Structure formats: structure tokens, C-alpha cells
Regions:
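An amphipathic alpha-helical interaction segment
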Residues: 107-122, 127-204
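Short helix-to-turn junction characteristic of helix-turn-helix DNA-binding domains
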Residues: 42, 206-209, 257-258
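Residue at a beta-strand N-cap/secondary-structure junction
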Residues: 56, 213, 262-263, 278
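Generic protein-terminus/edge-of-domain signal
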Residues: 1-64, 71-99, 116, 308
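Glycine- and charge-enriched low-complexity intrinsically disordered segments
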Residues: 98-106
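Intrinsically disordered or compositionally simple regulatory linkers and C-terminal tails
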Residues: 304-311
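Hydrophobic residues on short alpha-helical segments
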Residues: 39, 150, 203, 252-255
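Basic/polar phosphate-binding segments, predominantly the helix-turn-helix DNA-binding elements
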Residues: 170, 174-180, 201-252, 269-298
Length: 312
């Protein structure tokens, strides 16, 4: 899973909403269609999740459902319970007795990802990822992450955006890793690619050294395959040719350098495989639709205004 680890380290959550809700009696809320990653974790009790054109899911305590590509759905106390818009639900959920033994405790949230960087995995994931999470202390990275998210959501002095961002990033990547461990080895998708001894080596090398001017010959040698076989297998499993994936990876790293550092474009360019500021800027605009300078200004504006919201 070396190649997967490199990708997971680069994926980051942004535009954060984290909600801890405790409800009893008939209840239900509807989540609007959207592109954000959405999750619901049942910490206590049970809940039902309904989707258009899909079977209703019953979640018991300790179960998590994540919608990697968003999508409309409803969460309720029963399979046919009424669901109101989420904003209405949150505004009217006062009066619930916290000590009601029949109450349901939910930890829910949504966040966005760099969808360009995350696209290979998002394409491979199902519409809904359901996981059973053991919540005993030290059970797994996923249970530890959810335990910390619950603590942050319940903290009255909440406001540490950096902590929550890191926890939500961890929630996504550990959920991906857990799901990847559970799928069939015969699956032909990005997660099978990162577990393949051939394709994973090439992916890992691209992740480690995006600045290198990789050729198809060099990548196929890393994979231990002929050029034709490597190109065919890579494209079939990853969903795009090797150099298209490499460009996607480079632009994802460039985005993080633009957001997190004050490096000049001339300094960023060689770190992501471009010989000049001009060639980097041209490639970035082609991939992202804006110039690197425009992207950095927009990112600084988002950072200044803040993104974290919480309701309890």
C-alpha cells in the first residue's frame, strides 16, 4: 500500500462543517445534492439512511456511512420517517433531553477535497461507503479519528479549524484504506492499482519524485513491465494514461505549495517537474482553469475569511 500512503498524505479536507446531534422521538433530515464529501456516524442508537433509487440502510451504533461524491439522501429514525431540510431540523431540534436513554447521538459533517487530486479514488469508490467501526480505545486509526472528532464537536470552546481539518482528512483517508482492504483483489480500479506490485511501484515513484522528467520507458521499468503492457494496465486500472495521472499529481502538489508557502512560481515550477515559470503557469491554467497567481489570491481570501462552521 506504499503508493496509497503517498496519495493519502496529500489529500486534505477544506470547507468544513462538523455537527454533533442528539435526538429522540420521530426525527429526520434531508441532505441536498452537492459535491462535498458527507458522512454520518452513529455514536449511540440507530438511524436509517435513504437514497433515491437505492435500498434503505440501517445504521447501528458504531457504524459510519460516507458519501464520497455527495448526493441527495435522508437520515431518519425509521425507514419511512418524515425528513425535513437539514437547516430546519437543526433550527428546531431544541428541547431534546440529553439523558434520554432512547436518544440517538450522531456525529456528522461535510467537507470538500481537491477533486482534481482525489478524482482517481473518487471514481473508484461507490456512491456510499459503509463501515463498521469498533470504538474500543486504540482499536484502529478510524475509531481513534471518530473519537477525536466527537470530542471536538462536543467541546464548548470549539474553534480549532486546523485540528478539525486534519481529523476530517484522516477520516476520509482511513475510510478509503479500510474500504480498499475489504474489496475484491480482482477489482479493476484505482484501489486495485495501488495494491498491484507492478502499477503501485510506478505510482509510488511518481508520488515520491514529481519533479523528475519521467518517461514511459522509465515508469515501465519501475513497474517491471513492457511499455505497452504498462500503459495498457495503468490506463485500465487508474482511469487515465500514466502522464495524465502524473500531471494531475503535479498540479495537486503545486496547489498545496501555492496555498501553504510563499515560494515564487519560479521556485515551485522545478519542484513539480517544469523547467520554467512559463511552462508551469501554462500547464496549471490548462489543468485548473486559472493561473497560479489567481489561484493563490483566491486561496488567501478563503483562508482569511475562514471556513469552519459548527452546530451542536
Amino acid at each position: 500500500m506504499h503508493a496509497l500512503n503517498g496519495w493519502l498524505k496529500a489529500v486534505r479536507a477544506d470547507g468544513l462543517i462538523l455537527v454533533r446531534t442528539r435526538v429522540a422521538g420521530p426525527w429526520g433530515y434531508a441532505v441536498e445534492p452537492g459535491d462535498d464529501v458527507v458522512f454520518h456516524f452513529v455514536a449511540e442508537g440507530r438511524a436509517f439512511v435513504r437514497r433515491p433509487d437505492a435500498e434503505t440502510m440501517e445504521l447501528q451504533a458504531g457504524e459510519l456511512v460516507m458519501f464520497p461524491r455527495g448526493g441527495a439522501h435522508e437520515v431518519a429514525n425509521s425507514a419511512r420517517g418524515k425528513a425535513v431540510p437539514h437547516e430546519t431540523f437543526m433550527a428546531k431540534r431544541n428541547g431534546v433531553v440529553d439523558h434520554d436513554p432512547n436518544a440517538v447521538t450522531l456525529i456528522c459533517g461535510h467537507f470538500n477535497l481537491d477533486r482534481h487530486l482525489a478524482l482517481p479514488a473518487l471514481r473508484a469508490l461507490p456512491q456510499a461507503v459503509t463501515l463498521r467501526v469498533g470504538m474500543e480505545a486504540g482499536f484502529s486509526p478510524l475509531s481513534d479519528t471518530l473519537r477525536l472528532l466527537r470530542r471536538e464537536a462536543e467541546n464548548p470552546n470549539f474553534g480549532n479549524e486546523i485540528v478539525v481539518r486534519n481529523l476530517l482528512s484522516s477520516l476520509f483517508v482511513t475510510s478509503c484504506a479500510n474500504w480498499a482492504d475489504a474489496i475484491s483483489p480482482a477489482a479493476n480500479d484505482w484501489f486495485s492499482a495501488v495494491r498491484s506490485p507492478h502499477i503501485a511501484r510506478a505510482l509510488g515513484r511518481m508520488h515520491e519524485a514529481p519533479e523528475r522528467a519521467w518517461t514511459l520507458e522509465e515508469l515501465s521499468q519501475e513497474a517491471g513491465l513492457s511499455r505497452a503492457a504498462f500503459a495498457r494496465i495503468f490506463s485500465a486500472s487508474v482511469g487515465e494514461p500514466p502522464h495524465s495521472y502524473l500531471t494531475r499529481w503535479r498540479m495537486g502538489i503545486a496547489v498545496q505549495l501555492l496555498e501553504d508557502t510563499d515560494l515564487r512560481l519560479a521556485e515551485i515550477a522545478p519542484r513539480v517537474g517544469y523547467r520554467s515559470e512559463f511552462s508551469f503557469s501554462r500547464a496549471f491554467k490548462l489543468a485548473r482553469g486559472v493561473s497560479p497567481i489567481q489561484y493563490r489570491r483566491a486561496a488567501q481570501s478563503r483562508s482569511f475569511h475562514g471556513t469552519l462552521s459548527r452546530k451542536a
